[in-house]
Amino acid sequence: MKFLKYFTFELRLRYRNPSQIFFVFIFPLFLMFAFSSSFGKSIPHYIENNIASILLYSVLSASLTSLSVQIADYQSRKIYQLFVQRGIKKLFYIIAQIVSFMIIIFCSTLVILVVAHYAYDYEFPKLSLLILFYLKLYLYSIPFCLLAMIIGLLAKNTATASAIAMLLMFLSFFFSGMMIPLAQLSGGIRKIADNFFLTQLLSDLNHTLTSNYTVVPNWSRISLSVGLICLLALLVYRRKA
């Protein structure tokens, strides 16, 4: 019951924050319109073939930018310490924050799908396929929520957290082919992109909806990358607990 109380409290806060509404709802839609205008003319069926990337914009915007800033705000203003003094476990509350962002990500991605349907005649996939996609999307968003926790706990203030998160988000966009299509990358950048764990997760998401891989996922490399993020998150939390 306490977890539900914290979760609903955080969920209400998310919808009252204009900057978080922008990054979770407006920013992903802006990127969809911008990139479809830039690449849609030269790449046939751009929206249909890249809908997984477009939906992942919402995940990265919500987890890396919004969540990290929120955690940094609570950390810098010692709100977590106040919770601990009242008998609330810090990790317990951070998990409630993460879950609240998961719900917002779900709402944001639904908005993107509806806009893509009416603006670009995107056809919704079968319900069973959509459920499988969302299960994978939530699973693959966990490492980025952990990265947001790491940034938020280590940053001295919200401005620092925002700057680090924005840089990390745009680098992730670039090296995963979410900003520039992989086919247009070459040389060393393409090699980095092909081996980047987000590129491979995105490829699996894309395969779920379109039956096409952009790169073949290397699950051992993905597991190693996610394992390192989990280990770093554990070390940072113990240090800042």
Residue ranges and their predicted role:
Residues 2-8, 180-220:
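Short hydrophobic, aromatic-rich alpha-helical segments embedded in or entering the lipid bilayer
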Residues 13-41, 47-66, 102-107, 165-174, ...:
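Hydrophobic alpha-helical transmembrane segments of multi-pass membrane transport/permease proteins
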Residues 19-20, 92, 97, 160, ...:
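Residue-level recognition of membrane-helix boundary sites in multi-pass small-molecule transporters
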Residues 30, 47-119:
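Hydrophobic alpha-helical transmembrane segments of multi-pass membrane transport proteins
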Residues 33-41, 155-195:
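Transmembrane helix segments
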Residues 34-36, 108, 200-241:
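Alpha-helical transmembrane segments of multi-pass membrane transporters/translocases
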Residues 35-43, 68, 116-125, 155-156, ...:
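Short helix-capping/hinge motifs at transmembrane helix termini and TM-loop junctions
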Residues 90, 98-165, 170, 215-223, ...:
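Alpha-helical transmembrane segments and their short interhelical loops
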